[in-house]
């Protein structure tokens, strides 16, 4: 939804439409390229972060990235270094195949699912236990 702004300059009254100037995000969310972001400086497990983001907005999930410019935008609004990304179980759920092309039917990964955090200082993605606690940035498409 667009926003209208009323401005009065002396005897001139002007209405400005702000529709089309960016994503229509809730007032406490930041917008970038048609998505809404909200930074939460609250440490929680990955499962709790996923649930928490959905509670903040029904279409929201821990952040994921489509470009380095998006990372730069997010880093500009962060006040902490490590945060959950919307990616989990990277080893147990991958569709793996052996070097000869046959499907991997037997797996012996650790039982602990793996999740991913982003280190904002150098944009490195790190695999870590989903049971650890980190901050979260929630994201949804506007």
Swiss-Prot record:
The keyword Nucleotide-binding does not apply. The keyword rRNA-binding does not apply. It comes from the Eukaryota. Residues 32-139 form the C-type lectin domain. Interferes with one step of hemostasis (modulation of platelet aggregation, or coagulation cascade, for example). Keywords: Disulfide bond, Hemostasis impairing toxin, Lectin, Secreted, Signal, Toxin. Its main location: secreted. InterPro entries: C-type_lectin-like (IPR001304), C-type_lectin-like/link_sf (IPR016186), C-type_lectin/snaclec_domain (IPR050111), C-type_lectin_CS (IPR018378), CTDL_fold (IPR016187). One of its GO terms (molecular function) is carbohydrate binding. It holds the Pfam family Lectin_C. Residues 1-23 form the signal peptide. This is C-type lectin 13. It is found in: Secreted. Expressed by the venom gland.
């Amino acid at each position: 939804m667009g926003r209208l702004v009323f401005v009065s300059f002396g005897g001139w009254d002007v209405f400005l439409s702000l529709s089309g100037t960016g994503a229509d995000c809730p007032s406490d969310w930041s917008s970038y390229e048609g998505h809404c972001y909200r930074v939460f400086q609250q440490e929680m497990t990955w499962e709790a972060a996923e649930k928490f983001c959905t509670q903040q907005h029904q279409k929201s999930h821990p952040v994921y990235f489509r470009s380095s410019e998006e990372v730069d935008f997010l880093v500009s609004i962060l006040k902490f270094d490590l945060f959950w990304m919307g990616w989990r179980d990277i080893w147990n759920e991958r569709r793996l195949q052996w070097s000869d092309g046959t499907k991997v039917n037997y797996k012996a990964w650790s039982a602990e699912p793996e999740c991913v955090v982003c280190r904002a200082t150098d944009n490195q993605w790190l695999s870590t236990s989903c049971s650890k606690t980190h901050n979260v940035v929630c994201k949804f498409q506007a």
